[in-house]
Amino acid sequence: MAPRARRRRQLPAPLLALCVLLVPLQVTLQVTPPCTQERHYEHLGRCCSRCEPGKYLSSKCTPTSDSVCLPCGPDEYLDTWNEEDKCLLHKVCDAGKALVAVDPGNHTAPRRCACTAGYHWNSDCECCRRNTECAPGFGAQHPLQLNKDTVCTPCLLGFFSDVFSSTDKCKPWTNCTLLGKLEAHQGTTESDVVCSSSMTLRRPPKEAQAYLPSLIVLLLFISVVVVAAIIFGVYYRKGGKALTANLWNWVNDACSSLSGNKESSGDRCAGSHSATSSQQEVCEGILLMTREEKMVPEDGAGVCGPVCAAGGPWAEVRDSRTFTLVSEVETQGDLSRKIPTEDEYTDRPSQPSTGSLLLIQQGSKSIPPFQEPLEVGENDSLSQCFTGTESTVDSEGCDFTEPPSRTDSMPVSPEKHLTKEIEGDSCLPWVVSSNSTDGYTGSGNTPGEDHEPFPGSLKCGPLPQCAYSMGFPSEAAASMAEAGVRPQDRADERGASGSGSSPSDQPPASGNVTGNSNSTFISSGQVMNFKGDIIVVYVSQTSQEGPGSAEPESEPVGRPVQEETLAHRDSFAGTAPRFPDVCATGAGLQEQGAPRQKDGTSRPVQEQGGAQTSLHTQGSGQCAE
């Protein structure tokens, strides 16, 4: 390094003097700068100053003065250094063209106009146009730019847009958990999430909704049934029991009527079958009886008539003169026949008979309960004399010769109940067989209805006077038919004689008279009123004429009778089935051909120790002496 320093030479003196002269020249060049283009302009060989922003150049510079500048007026502006002789005007923002002043401007800055919201500036037409609207599921991209069209973007997961808009962006789904609710439906890009309250149940499925109407109808039906059952129970408790009882009675009556119709047809068939029986069966001990008193002859020839005249089974019983009056065995029970009660009185017509009165000889199965006549005192009870009510041990006082019988045949008129006393021995032409043309089978008109006398009727020995036949007329009825007297006239005559209105036919009765429309007793002893099936009266010759009298009194004594009004003949009530009162007619026990004694008095019913003249009183299915 030292050798190099030694090689440096000093400047010569002339150079140093030149440098001293040049230094002041350098200082002068730096004090006077040159003319620039931005703020100066060159005029007359010199640089002049320009006007600043907001002013304009009023006059240029001179060699002795600089440029003169003035400020801009209202709505004018100049935003740069200028040498302009005037200012610029601001723009006008027209609202009709959807323009709005964004910056009003000043002297140094211009005014700026922009399109209103929903419009954008189109440089092609220098005007504002409407922005594009985004469809549901799309949203406008933010931030929105002025004077620019809307940019639509699809909504992301968790966001949705459900409207058409050029400014709305996609909105997020509602968070149901933050609201304290349950999510009912999940959201989409076009719809939000549906939230429900925690107490609100979810909507039932469609299947449950389909069964809901059926369930409602079933509940309504059950309610109606329950209400109806309650109403019926209350009504049945108050008055429904009587209604139920009436309904059951009606059903029972209907069933009884149907059963009665069937059994009635069966009875008719049974009656037809019995009517076509052979002659051999008739002669085995069963004979039909007429309403006339018929006596069996000693030889028994008149019993069978033409059927058994030649002999046969009746040959063994020719010497028998006594027969018992019994009922024909019913082939079939007539359940439809109504049985009257004790306090029921009806006047309806009697029903057609299905049976017939028969005669069987003693010794057969039908044996009377009393083999010997019974006698009852004035103070004794007569209930023991009724068949079927008392035993035979207590019936010592009764005098029954023949048992009571019952028949289903109904008399046509009261005249057929009349009885009379017949003496003598003759045949019995009234006995017929089932195949005989003279017999009465119950299917046609009886001879008694035609009021024609029965030919060959003979008076025979003692037989029951209350014989209930199948329609053969009595001798009195035959005589009435021959004389041309109507049964009604005869009935009136009989009623008059029974009441004592005709003293010539019937002498006045002695003793006490008591009774009602159903029964009348004439006696000299204690008067008794009875209401029963059968009334048995025994009167002796001495009891009628009074004790201690050996000779008959001058005044004739009437026979004891039992009267019954014609209107109530078929309405006598008792515990037995309804049967006509054959022997209970008023005047039937008197007159009608009965023999009278020499002193004018009628013959008593039965004499103590006398002939066995039986008075059969046909009551409610029984006959008494």
Curated annotation (Swiss-Prot):
Binding of Na(+): at which residues?
134-135, 138, 161, 163
User: What ranges does the record give for the region Required for interaction with EEIG1 and osteoclast differentiation, renumbered to this chain?
Assistant: 532-537
Q: Which UniProt keywords apply?
A: Cell membrane, Disulfide bond, Glycoprotein, Membrane, Metal-binding, Phosphoprotein, Receptor, Repeat, Signal, Sodium, Transmembrane, Transmembrane helix
Cytoplasmic compartment: which residues? 235-625
Cellular localisation: Cell membrane; Membrane raft
List all topological domains (Extracellular): 31-214
Q: Where are the TNFR-Cys repeats?
A: 35-69, 72-113, 115-152, 155-195
Record keyword Membrane present:
yes
Composition skew (Polar residues), residue ranges: 512-524, 603-625
- Taking the first listed entry, what is the main subcellular location of this protein, grouped into a coarse class? membrane
Locate the transmembrane regions by residue number: 215-234
Q: What is this protein called?
A: Tumor necrosis factor receptor superfamily member 11A
